[in-house]
C-alpha cells in the first residue's frame, strides 16, 4: 500500500463547482494531503483560494455553451492547448490522484489524468449529469453522485450527496418547533447571489394577498435579493404597503446562512444543487421555483428529489404568481403539522459529512493501488 500525499482538484467558474470542492479540499488537507488546484486565470476560484495555501495552476479552458460562433470556431485550439497545459502541470506536480467537479476545466484536466494514468475521481453536484462528467465517467476510478440515480448503476458510482458547510449541517440537529407554536410563520427567501427576479417580484405580491385575507397571518420575512435586485425588491415591498422593518428584512446577501436557516420555518427559492442540499440537511420545508432556462432542466430535477419525498412544493416559473404563492404559504401556515412533516422528510433524506466521506473514499482507494 502507498499513502496518498498529493491531490489535484479541478473546479472553476461557478460557486456550485468551487464551494463543494473547497469543502473536500479541507478534509483532504486535514488528512495530511497536499492539495493543488486547477482553474482559470481571473476566475472566481482564484480569488476564493487566496490564503488557503493551495497551489493554484491556471489553464486556458473556457465554457462553450451559448458563447457564439467565434468561441466554437476556436474551440479545437483552445481544448488542445488546455489539454497540453494540464499534462505539463500534472507532470510537474505528479499528483497521486485527480478530483474533477465537472465544468469546463475538468474536461482537459480529466483527459490529461487519463493520458498520464492518474486515478480520476468525479463529483457531480446535480440530478442531471453535466456534459463533462458524462464523458469522463467512462474513464474515472470513482464517480460520486449527489442525487441517487444520476448515473447509470455501476460499481464505480457512489451516492454521497453534496458537501455542506459544517455550521449549516449543525442546524439540522434540531428541527423547528412548529406544531405547538402560535408565533408568525418565518419565511426565508433566497433570491440567489445573482438575484432571482421572478421570486423577488412575486414575494411582495404574495404577502399583500395574505394581508388582505388575514392581517394577523402575515409571516416574518428575511429576503435575500442578490446585489443587482436589492433596490427594485425594496421598492416592490414599499409599493405593496410594507415597511422594511418589524419582521421584514431585505438584504442583498446573507452572511450567516446557518443562523438564517435556524431561524426559518419555510424556505422559498431556486433549486440549485447547493441550496437543495442545504435545505435537506437543515431539515426545513420549502417551496421551490426552479430556474427555467437550463437546457436540461437541472434545477427542476434537483427539486423533484425533495418533492418526491413530500419534503417540498414545486412551483414552475410559468405558474408562479402572487395568488399561487400566497395560497401555498397560507396552507402551510394553517397546518403546522404538515409543515413539520415536510421538514422531517427533508432532514431524513440528507446525507451528512459528505466532504469527509469523499476524502475517506479517495484516500482508501488511492492507498490500495
Feature-to-residue mapping (PLM):
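C-terminal "capping" alpha-helix adjacent to the active site of nucleotide-linked donor transferases
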Residues: 313-316, 320-337
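C-terminal alpha-helical cap of glycosyltransferases
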Residues: 351-369
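Active-site-proximal region of nucleotide-activated glycan assembly enzymes
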Residues: 34, 55, 114-174
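Glycosyltransferases and closely related glycan-assembly transferases
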Residues: 85-99, 106-121, 134-138
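A short, well-ordered alpha-helix in the C-terminal region of glycosyltransferases
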Residues: 338-352
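Conserved nucleotide-sugar phosphate-binding/catalytic loop shared by glycosyltransferases and other
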Residues: 4-12, 29-81, 227-229, 318
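Donor-nucleotide binding loops and adjacent catalytic segments primarily
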Residues: 48, 52, 173-267, 300-304, ...
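Acidic donor-binding loop of glycosyltransferase active sites
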Residues: 95-97, 259-277, 284
Amino acid at each position: 500500500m502507498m499513502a496518498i500525499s498529493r491531490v489535484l482538484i479541478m473546479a472553476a467558474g461557478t460557486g456550485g463547482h468551487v464551494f463543494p470542492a473547497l469543502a473536500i479540499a479541507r478534509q483532504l488537507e486535514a488528512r495530511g494531503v497536499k492539495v493543488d488546484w486547477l482553474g482559470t486565470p481571473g476566475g472566481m476560484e482564484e480569488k476564493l483560494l487566496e490564503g488557503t495555501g493551495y497551489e493554484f495552476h491556471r489553464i486556458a479552458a473556457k465554457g462553450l455553451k451559448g458563447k457564439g460562433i467565434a468561441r466554437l470556431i476556436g474551440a479545437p485550439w483552445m481544448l488542445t492547448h488546455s489539454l497540453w497545459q494540464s499534462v505539463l502541470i500534472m507532470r510537474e506536480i505528479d499528483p497521486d490522484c485527480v478530483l474533477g467537479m465537472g465544468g469546463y476545466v475538468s474536461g482537459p484536466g480529466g483527459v490529461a489524468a487519463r493520458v498520464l494514468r492518474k486515478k480520476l475521481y468525479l463529483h457531480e453536484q446535480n440530478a442531471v449529469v453535466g456534459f463533462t462528467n458524462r464523458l469522463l465517467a467512462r474513464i474515472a476510478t470513482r464517480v460520486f453522485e449527489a442525487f441517487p440515480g444520476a448515473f447509470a448503476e455501476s460499481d464505480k458510482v457512489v451516492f454521497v450527496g453534496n458537501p455542506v458547510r459544517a455550521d449549516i449541517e449543525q442546524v439540522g440537529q434540531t428541527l423547528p418547533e412548529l406544531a405547538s407554536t402560535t408565533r408568525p410563520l418565518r419565511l426565508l427567501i433566497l433570491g440567489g447571489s445573482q438575484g432571482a427576479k421572478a421570486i423577488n417580484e412575486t414575494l411582495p405580491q404574495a404577502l399583500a394577498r395574505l394581508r388582505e385575507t388575514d392581517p394577523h397571518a402575515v409571516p416574518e420575512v428575511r429576503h435575500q435579493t442578490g446585489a443587482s435586485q436589492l433596490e427594485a425588491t425594496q421598492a416592490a415591498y414599499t409599493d405593496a404597503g410594507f415597511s422594511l422593518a418589524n419582521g421584514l428584512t431585505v438584504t442583498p446577501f446573507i452572511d450567516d446562512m446557518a443562523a438564517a436557516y435556524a431561524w426559518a420555518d419555510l424556505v422559498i427559492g431556486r433549486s440549485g444543487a447547493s441550496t437543495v442540499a442545504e435545505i435537506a440537511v437543515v431539515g426545513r420545508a420549502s417551496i421551490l421555483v426552479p430556474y427555467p432556462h437550463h437546457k436540461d432542466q437541472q434545477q427542476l430535477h434537483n427539486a423533484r428529489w425533495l418533492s418526491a419525498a413530500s419534503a417540498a412544493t414545486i412551483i414552475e416559473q410559468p405558474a408562479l404568481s402572487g395568488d399561487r404563492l400566497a395560497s401555498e404559504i397560507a396552507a402551510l401556515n394553517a397546518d403546522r403539522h404538515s409543515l413539520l412533516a415536510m421538514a422531517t422528510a427533508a432532514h431524513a433524506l440528507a446525507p451528512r459529512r459528505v466532504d469527509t466521506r469523499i476524502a475517506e473514499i479517495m484516500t482508501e482507494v488511492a492507498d490500495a493501488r
